[in-house]
Regions:
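Flavin-dependent oxidoreductase catalytic cores
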Residues: 1-162, 166-182
């Protein structure tokens, strides 16, 4: 709390806060085993000591964030990985299309390769892409220019997809967008 007051007095315009540090990085971007809204209780305490806006991140759920904002405990909800999974997240919230949201599952399997865990961002190898972040649920993430996912097929086919898990549904969706007849 003293640090928050110090930063405000030093001229900071906003605090985007979580419980993470270099040694406890998982609090900054909580994995699946961390509870939803896991930083909320501590971050809302900042509003008691500062007058600048306070933003909370870390698997924030819109209903809980909205309640905290309405109560004056927060000024905004921080969103990061959720945009990798579903870039239209905010639009879908505004339009109340909750069942259309592709939720981040906090798996860390694809989005975190953009970090080396050495305290610096990595150099992205455009040719290889092995160090480039992706999303386990959204194959378009960071590949929008590399692959044309919506390009119509020159020859349409009947495609059978065996399995309706995440991968099967993604394959079926992309194949249908490309004009193929898909059976799951």
């Amino acid at each position: 709390l003293k640090a928050a007051k110090y930063l405000q007095d030093a001229g900071y315009d906003m605090l985007n806060a979580d419980n993470g540090t270099y040694d406890s990085w998982y609090w900054a971007h909580p994995p699946v085993y961390m509870p939803l809204n896991c930083n909320m209780a501590e971050v809302t305490r900042l509003k008691e000591v500062v007058e600048i806006p306070v933003v909370c991140a870390g698997r924030m759920q819109p209903d809980e964030a909205s309640a905290s904002i309405s109560e004056g405990k927060l000024d905004a909800m921080g969103i990061g990985r959720q945009f990798l999974a579903d870039p239209e997240y905010i639009v879908k919230l505004e339009q109340e299309k909750f069942s259309d949201i592709l939720p981040c599952i906090a798996c860390h399997n694809a989005c975190l390769p953009i970090y080396h865990y050495e305290g610096v961002g990595c150099e992205i190898d455009e040719e290889d892409g092995k160090t480039q972040g992706h999303c386990a649920l959204n194959p378009r993430t960071f590949c929008e220019q590399k692959y044309d996912f919506e390009k119509k097929a020159a020859v349409t086919k009947s495609i059978a997809v065996i399995g309706g898990g995440i991968a099967g549904m993604t394959v079926a969706r992309i194949a249908a967008i490309r004009g193929h007849e898909v059976t799951i």
